[in-house]
Amino acid sequence: MMDNILHIVPYTAQHGQFILSCQMNHKVLEADRHYINVDGDARNLVQDHLAFTGIVNDNPIFAAGMKMIWGQVAEGWVIATSEMWKHPLGVAKAIKKDFARVAKENNITRVQSAIRKDFSEGQRFAEWLGLEKEGLMRKWGFDGSDQYMYARLF
C-alpha cells in the first residue's frame, strides 16, 4: 500500500502500539505522554467491530473507535500520529463516516469522550461529530488537567 492513499482497516493492538509510540498529534497532548502504557493501552482499545485504523504507505497514522463502558454506553476515542496532519480531510471524513454507523450497528445509545479544556481543536472536532459539551470535569485528566465531557445520544 505505498500509494499515499488513506486505507481504512480494522483496528489491531499492533496499530495502536505503533501510533502511541510515535509523537502525539498535537503539542497539548504531549502532557499525557508520561501516562501512556503503549502495550497495555493499545490492547485495551481492541473491541470487535468498534474500532478502525487509517493507514498510509503501510503505516498507521490514526485509529478511532468506541470502547463499551456498561450497557449501551461507550467511550469514544481517537489516537493519531503527527502524520495525520498530512491527510486532515481524509482522516476527519473517515471518522465521521463510521462514527454514527458503528454506534447504530452496535445498539449504542450514548457515546461520550473527555477532551482537555486546553485542546480547542479536539473540542471543535467533537462538536463537528455531533457531540455536545455536557460539563467541565475539574482535575480529571491524567496530569490533573480540567477536561470537558462531550456526548452524543443515538
Question: Over which residues does each language-model region extend?
Answer:
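C-terminal "cap" of GNAT-fold acetyltransferases
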Residues: 139-154
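A short, internal acetyl-CoA/4′-phosphopantetheine-binding micro-motif in the GNAT/acyltransferase core
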Residues: 78-94
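Conserved beta-strand-loop-alpha-helix junction that forms the acyl-donor binding cleft
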Residues: 108-127, 132, 140-141
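A conserved beta-turn-beta hairpin within the catalytic core of GNAT-like acetyltransferases
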Residues: 68-78, 146
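Short amphipathic alpha-helix that is part of the acyltransferase structural core
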Residues: 1-36
